[in-house]
Regions:
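Active-site phosphate-binding/coordination module
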Residues: 25-138
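Conserved acidic, metal-coordinating active-site core of Asp-based
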Residues: 113-217
Length: 217
């Protein structure tokens, strides 16, 4: 990684599939490359769909802290040492209830993020197992901040009991309902929708933020 004449002032790095390797870690080589960029005056920004708790754990694998964290697909922006985000735009309780109702209608479940926690159901757990079979480790379910919910009633209870606002949602629908879900979500008019296809078309996911929120365009 070369930075001739300080041509670059800022380096924005995604985590999954970019900075993190198949073991869900920052390699020593990449950590050294990021540090060399910092020494040349380049600001390092970690941009990801993950929440602040997760990103801080990965930033600890770098040789020096990044300058900024853009988390939950742009819903929260802060410096690593800050207790609170400098920019924050969350989903409202009504938004979350609408997403849950849509999931119940289509017999799927979401992931819901706060800055500190991830709530997930069977669809995301199936993805984790799929990735583990291929040798990829995305997260350890036993770690602090991860909560598995296996019924609609538990989802409603989580909305009631969680004291932090939800920053984003992610759906992992089957192929046959993915396009229809995107269409319904867009029709609601309240959300920023980012559908994507992974693993050669095997997996469709839909990231949902409050309207106007994204990692950067």
């Amino acid at each position: 990684m070369a930075f001739p004449g300080n041509q670059y002032k800022l380096l924005a790095l995604d985590l999954d599939g970019t900075l993190l390797n198949e073991k869900n870690q920052v390699s020593p080589r990449d950590a050294q490359a990021v540090r060399r960029a910092q020494e040349r005056g380049v600001q390092i920004v970690l941009c990801t769909g993950r929440n602040v708790r997760e990103v801080r754990a990965f930033s600890d694998q770098l040789l020096a802290l990044p300058d900024w964290l853009v988390t939950s697909s742009g819903a929260a922006v802060q410096r690593p040492q800050d207790a609170e985000p400098q920019f924050f735009s969350s989903l409202s309780l009504t938004h979350c209830e609408e997403i849950l109702a849509l999931c119940e209608e289509f017999e799927t479940d979401p992931c819901l993020y706060t800055t500190q926690s991830l709530y997930y159901g069977g669809a995301f757990r199936a993805l984790l197992r799929h990735l583990e079979q291929g040798g990829q480790i995305v997260m350890n379910e036993a770690d602090e901040g991860y909560f598995y919910l296996d019924s609609h009633e538990k989802w409603l209870k989580a909305l009631e009991s969680e004291t932090l606002p939800f920053t984003k949602a992610v759906l992992y629908p089957s192929h046959d309902i993915s396009d229809l879900l995107v269409s319904r979500l867009k029709h609601m008019g309240s959300f920023e929708i980012a559908p994507s296809v992974m693993f050669g078309g095997e997996l469709h996911n839909i990231e949902i933020n409050r309207r106007g929120v994204n990692k950067g365009q």
